[in-house]
Amino acid sequence: MTVTLGMPAAPPRPVGTRRLSRQIHVGNVPVGGDAPVSIQSMCTTLTSDVNATLQQIAQLTAAGCQIVRVAVPSQDDADALPTIARKSPIPIIADIHFQPKYVFAAIDAGCAAVRVNPGNIKQFDDKVGEIARAAKAAGTPIRIGVNAGSLDKRLLEKYGKATPEALVESALWEASLFEEHDFRDIKISVKHNDPVIMIQAYRLLAQACDYPLHLGVTEAGPAFQGTVKSAVAFGALLSEGIGDTIRVSLSAPPIEEIKVASAILESLGLRERKLEIVSCPSCGRAQVDVYTLANEVSAGLEGMEVPLRVAVMGCVVNGPGEAREADLGVASGNGKGQIFVRGKVIKTVPEAQIVETLIEEAMRLAEQMEADGAASGSPSVSVA
């Protein structure tokens, strides 16, 4: 039987036209221009613990991280950079605060880029020329990372607090200092913990320069709160074409940041869709435990590398219609489930066999898609 699948192999076009920015390269990852929006995270290990750091980087890479940042608060951390930069499977960005000497150590170590915070590096403006020369000689991009929590005191006095205008002025001022030394291998971030202020700042920045922009809501909070803040801010900006690389900051294991970032990009059509569950909130009409069914189907399909859409429906109101719109689906009721493949009922099974049947059919469809040369992605599961 030939099955026509509902989900397109290519993602839908993003909502807005992409902002045209200059392109830089962070290691082998292009950032800006027409390059796809890339995903970043940051290690939570002590950088001086080389083995633990490399192990976490490997886990992040497997989850889909493309660029990773490591903290360099001490000489021991700086001493670990050459080994980490050499052995990491993805580009390393050294995160530098307070001590400009670590900027030069990171460049010498072969890091793919260096993040500097102009708000807290001692005599940063006086060091820009030396940093620019070293970075240019090594081909190392610089990220000017402005943060609301460490804004230059001069700007706080001028604006009274970390306003969007203050964040942007800080970033553009530091960029202009690098430009005076003919260095433009730059990307910029202007982070705030309030997504509304953050959105306003990036909109202003996008109009004022053509540097690639790294998006982030700083100190976003625990997993749930941070996910909501990041989704709101990134969704608004990326739908307007603003943003070239993103990091979801969560008070959670960094691998969770990658999952959220990937889901945000997929939801906007900026990355091929993978595992996606669309489920109803359940109600008194549901004739099946939707929560358990959705979780079991999701767990059973986790890791499948094809863009498959599966619908798991809990009642007869929207169930049949939603299931027909999916590549694979079930409409549940009266202790049984009708299994749909691309809108056609192929069998009816007892409720106890729904999960097993869906997983079996998903595997079969995945094999067919791979045989037909479909682009890889993960399954997309819809539950209601």
From Swiss-Prot:
Cofactor mode of binding and number, as noted: Binds 1 [4Fe-4S] cluster.
Binding site for [4Fe-4S] cluster: C280, C283, C315, E322
GO MF term set: 4 iron, 4 sulfur cluster binding; 4-hydroxy-3-methylbut-2-en-1-yl diphosphate synthase activity (ferredoxin); 4-hydroxy-3-methylbut-2-enyl-diphosphate synthase activity (flavodoxin); iron ion binding
Catalytic activity: (2E)-4-hydroxy-3-methylbut-2-enyl diphosphate + oxidized [flavodoxin] + H2O + 2 H(+) = 2-C-methyl-D-erythritol 2,4-cyclic diphosphate + reduced [flavodoxin]
Source superkingdom: Bacteria
Pathway: Isoprenoid biosynthesis; isopentenyl diphosphate biosynthesis via DXP pathway; isopentenyl diphosphate from 1-deoxy-D-xylulose 5-phosphate: step 5/6
Keywords: 4Fe-4S, Iron, Iron-sulfur, Isoprene biosynthesis, Metal-binding, Oxidoreductase
A UniProt-annotated Pfam family: GcpE
Record EC number: 1.17.7.3
Needed cofactors: [4Fe-4S] cluster
A GO BP annotation: isopentenyl diphosphate biosynthetic process, methylerythritol 4-phosphate pathway
Keyword Phosphoprotein: no
Keyword Metal-binding on entry: yes
Enzyme class: oxidoreductase
Family: Belongs to the IspG family.
Job description of the protein: Converts 2C-methyl-D-erythritol 2,4-cyclodiphosphate (ME-2,4cPP) into 1-hydroxy-2-methyl-2-(E)-butenyl 4-diphosphate.
Identification of the protein by name: 4-hydroxy-3-methylbut-2-en-1-yl diphosphate synthase (flavodoxin)
Gene from which this protein is expressed: ispG
